[in-house]
Structures are given as C-alpha cells and as structure tokens.
Amino acid sequence: VAYTRSQLGLPVLLASQTLAQPKTAPHELPETKLDALVHLAGESLMGLWTAQKRERIWKSRVEMTQGLVRHLGTWKAENRPRVLVCASGAGFYGNRGDDLLDEASPSGAGFLAELCVEWEKAAKEAERLGMRVVMLRTGMVLGPDGGAFPLLKRVFGFGLGGRLGSGRQWMPWIHVEDAARLILRAVEQDSIRGPINLTAPEAVTNAIFTQSLAKALHRPAFFHAPIFAMRLLLRGMADEMLLGSQRVNPRVATDSGYTFTHPSLAGAFASLLGA
C-alpha cells in the first residue's frame, strides 16, 4: 500500500508497533491527522497450532484490534482517520466445499472462522467513532518476495510439488499487485464499507493450482500429500488452512468497477516468474 500510494505521489506514514495496549502506540500517531489507517498486523499462521500458538494468533488480531480502536477513541476527532481498513481472511467462510461464496455469505465453523468473526467485530467498533470500516477477507497472496510463493517456487522447482489431499478443495488467491490496489481502492472509495473479498475472480481447486504452477515452472508434479499424514504432522492447521475449501467470489471489488490486473492464475504465475 505504501508503495502504491508513493507511486501516486501521496504521503504515507508507516507505523510498526504493538498496539494491544494504547500506551505503546507510536507517538507520531496522536499528533498526526491521518486520512486512513490500514491495519494488517498479526502473528503468522504458519507453524504448528499449539495452544500457545493459537493464543498468539488470537491476541495479535482480535485483542490488538480492540486496543487499536480504544486508542483511536482517545484521539481528537479531527485527527482520527476517516477510514479504518483492517485485515481479515477468507477463512471467515470456513470449509464450504463447492459453495460459491461472496461477502454476503455467512461465516463458517472452525478456529479461523471464529477468529475472523471476532476480528471483524473488533474493527467495526471504529464505526462508533465516526469512521468508515472495511474488512479485507484475503486469500493467499502471491508475491515474489513474501508469503507462500517463494517456498512453493522452490519446492515445485525441484520437482517435488503435488496436490494436497484430494486436491478438490478450492483455494482463494490474489496477486500482490491486485491486493495492494484493492486496499488503496478501499481507502479512497467511500462506497466500499464492510467486508471485501481480496481474491482473484478465477477460483481454482488445489489440483488446478498445482498443475498450473508445475506447468509454469516446466516441472512435473507427481507427488501427493495424504490427508492422514498432513493431519498427523500439522493437526488443526491442516484441516483449516490446507484442506479447507473456500470458493470465493470478489463481488464487492467487481461491483465497485475494479478491473483485476492479474485475473487468471496462469497470468499471475507468468508475472511472478518474469515470463
């Protein structure tokens, strides 16, 4: 987002700080009149989901957002941002099989779904302060330098890629460039409020994702991760993050007039691989 706004010649204030307790907020924030606040902080979901890991995931999202909104409540009204854009996740929908999901679809079941529900509820409290609130229900972000793609590129590049379980589960994804542009659109377009799916319009299953990446890298993808092995090694994370199915439609984005730069998975891979 900072990159996108800087390209447009707009000033950006970056703040990296723990805001679970208001007293730890960067001192610049209360003194600065902000146009918008984009809140993307949170413990990584990667790793074994022990009880301690789940607690860190929850606190870094729900409790930190609660603390942030409380902190904004101490600001002078004229200094508060007019919009709070807060991260959420496509995990909001839970494991929904082949159901086609948009922003009006109800939440699902499971840890991630409950997390996203409470996370969004915490963000929406900022509406009481007169702020427009947007929640980003984000799929897997494909970018060259961060997230899952660099690891996937290495694994598939060695010819070790393969589908997860049956491969029939739907995988919401988005190119990092579209994610950044949609966040900027959420900041600047007043008609966007509430949840918005940050996912590409081309929904794909894990099997299709696997085949597409292998083809882009000119490598085979013969391997297959059995469900029982994934559950044994990763426990709850396997069912929710790797085997859960969300067939997500970015209805709010398309209804707002947004045109995706990378609407297809093959095109996204070509961009990331420099083809």
Describe each PLM feature range.
Residues 66-110:
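Conserved Rossmann-fold NAD(P)-dependent oxidoreductase catalytic core, especially the SDR/UDP-sugar
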Residues 239-275:
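C-terminal amphipathic/interface module of NAD(P)-dependent oxidoreductases
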Residues 182, 189-236, 270-275:
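Mid/C-terminal beta-alpha module of Rossmann-like enzyme folds, strongest
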Residues 124, 153-161, 169-204:
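Alpha-helical substrate-binding/gating segment
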Residues 37, 176-183, 198, 209, ...:
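Non-catalytic, hydrophobic alpha-helical segments
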